[in-house]
Amino acid sequence: MEFEMYLKNSGIEFLKDHPLKEFTTFKIGGKARYIVFPKSTKQLIEILTLAKDEAINYIVVGNCSNVLVSDKGYNGAIITTVKIDSFKIDGNLIEAECGAMLSHVARKACEAGLKGLEFAVGIPGTVGGAVYMNAGAYDGEIKDVFERAEVLDENLNPVELGRADMRFSYRNSRLKEEKMVLLRAVFCLKFADREDISPLQKANEFSKRRREKQPLSYPSAGSVFKRPPNNFAGKLIEDAGLKGYRIGGACISEKHAGFIINLGDAKAEDVRKLIYLAQKSVYEKFGILLEPEIQFIGEFETPLFVPVDGQNRR
């Protein structure tokens, strides 16, 4: 196959028919036909172009920190950007490639006395995934510091987008809506004033809060559901009596009910069943439909919950 020959001849690292669970923070997932590790945006574009020309299904991922991969795996190419990871700080601007780890970029920004990314120090995803999802925590979001980005549109044409072009909303962006791929992004931060709490101190406080409230000692994909308006998914799930509920090797965390954790041998279907149960229970008790925040890769036996009336009651 031309795709595989190109990878070999170009010296691009790849794995064939390899379990994805080795690369997801959930430690769950079947085999992918290919897992590819480009080292530059040039290689990334070439790989995507060839995959498209050969009609090979593909998905671009970062650190796989916000995904649930099917037990059946993925019949296509998983292209991970984690080796496209350079970034630089120039004054109050940060330019970062798609695979740079957001937490590392954010910490370096804090160390440089820049404020705006303190919330991101504990987020385990890449810059690409963070912009794609408009990642956020502790009242901060990527859209607050985003300046511009170079992306590939659905036809793999390079496009530069500014803040107004991105259509950011809660855990959403134009990249997600139009299946665009981020190559690099520029963030505009502010220098901390002398009377401010230092950005690093603030980031460390957020990290401490995460350790205290989140089940970080178990594999997971972070918050499973988006936050409903004027509420909290974890609280709703807890109030529905599901905290600690277990199916197979997956469990709704006792520490934070907004997390589903892998106790060691969880299957993707175990997680999907818990997601369905949480959605159904919360909807029946409170009339609120929880929307998954995590992304799903592959085919699943267990569906997501769909209310009979087809919409939220409130």
From Swiss-Prot:
This protein's UniProt keywords: Cell cycle, Cell division, Cell shape, Cell wall biogenesis/degradation, Cytoplasm, FAD, Flavoprotein, NADP, Oxidoreductase, Peptidoglycan synthesis
Active site: R171, S223, E293
Gene3D superfamilies: 3.30.465.10, UDP-N-acetylenolpyruvoylglucosamine reductase, C-terminal domain (3.90.78.10), Uridine Diphospho-n-acetylenolpyruvylglucosamine Reductase, domain 2 (3.30.43.10)
UniProt-listed PROSITE patterns: FAD_PCMH (PS51387)
EC top class named in words: oxidoreductase
A GO term from the CC aspect: cytosol
Record field: catalytic activity: UDP-N-acetyl-alpha-D-muramate + NADP(+) = UDP-N-acetyl-3-O-(1-carboxyvinyl)-alpha-D-glucosamine + NADPH + H(+)
Molecular functions per Gene Ontology: FAD binding; UDP-N-acetylmuramate dehydrogenase activity
Required cofactor names: FAD
InterPro entries in the record: FAD-bd_PCMH, FAD-bd_PCMH-like_sf, FAD-bd_PCMH_sub1, FAD-bd_PCMH_sub2, MurB, MurB_C, MurB_C_sf, Oxid_FAD_bind_N
Pathway assignment: Cell wall biogenesis; peptidoglycan biosynthesis
One GO term (biological process): regulation of cell shape
Domain FAD-binding PCMH-type: 27-192
Enzyme Commission number(s) from the entry: 1.3.1.98
Annotated localization: Cytoplasm
Pfam families in the record: FAD_binding_4, MurB_C
Function: Cell wall formation.
Family as reported in the entry's similarity comment: Belongs to the MurB family.
Name this polypeptide is given: UDP-N-acetylenolpyruvoylglucosamine reductase
Organism lineage: Bacteria, Bacillati, Bacillota, Bacillota incertae sedis, Caldicellulosiruptorales
